[in-house]
Amino acid sequence: MKRFTVLILAIFVAASTVEADVRFSLSGSSSTSYSKFIGDLRKALPSNGTVYNITLLLSSASGASRYTLMTLSNYDGKAITVAVDVTNVYIMGYLVNSTSYFFNESDAKLASQYVFKGSTIVTLPYSGNYEKLQTAAGKIREKIPLGFPALDSAITTLFHYDSTAAAAAFLVIIQTTAEASRFKYIEGQIIERISKNQVPSLATISLENEWSALSKQIQLAQTNNGTFKTPVVITDDKGQRVEITNVTSKVVTKNIQLLLNYKQNVAAFDEDVSAKH
């Protein structure tokens, strides 16, 4: 019996002491600490070099090397550790103590074989794409406030796994971490919301939806004299629709920080990638 107890304890300790690659704590946080965290997250994503000085994510990765881990702590010090796919910055699932929660999708199921080993696995009742999360939350992203207070609430919700509020919590965490790592503008929008919650701007939602399209056109522009083969329409910070046609646009030169690798993700680009996170 003693040996059995020791074994259970060893499994619990192994699952609950996962070493994260990047960390962010809301306790004592500031714009500086948040920007450092987002910068660290970008650096934690291995790349295939750059395209027009923008980091090009790996086309593929295998085994445990396909994932990076980030630990997020609320104002009370309660923490969750989140698994992120390094090829697309998609969140696969998260760990609290000895229990892990993964999205109900093939990529997340694969991730569960390599991260949070020894944990008790719970499969969430939805996948991680925006459409499914919004349906589960009963709200679209445009209606869900972002900010440090919202992040605190989201971490708390996932820490205790409140099933009725988890989907909305994921929407907050995805935008505060993954989307902010993809776009400097979104990082700045979160910083503006350090002390308050506010719904995302139309420009934020637009950039999130068009990340894959922008990634593709920026890569294709390399063989087209810097011109997009297909213009990408986004909404700017004034609420105006703007057509992006080449790599001289500020969206390319000052905003986007990561590119989804087009050459090895053709199938993904052929899907409705804007629905994914």
Curated annotation (Swiss-Prot):
Its EC number is 3.2.2.22. It comes from the Eukaryota. Pfam families: RIP (PF00161). It catalyses: Endohydrolysis of the N-glycosidic bond at one specific adenosine on the 28S rRNA. PROSITE patterns: SHIGA_RICIN. Keywords: Antiviral defense, Hydrolase, Plant defense, Protein synthesis inhibitor, Signal, Toxin. InterPro entries: Ribosome-inact_prot_sf (IPR036041), Ribosome_inactivat_1/2 (IPR017989), Ribosome_inactivat_prot (IPR001574), Ribosome_inactivat_prot_CS (IPR017988), Ribosome_inactivat_prot_sub1 (IPR016138), Ribosome_inactivat_prot_sub2 (IPR016139). GO terms for biological process: defense response to virus; negative regulation of translation. The keyword RNA-binding does not apply. Belongs to the ribosome-inactivating protein family. Type 1 RIP subfamily. This is Ribosome-inactivating protein luffin-alpha. It comes from Luffa aegyptiaca (Sponge gourd).
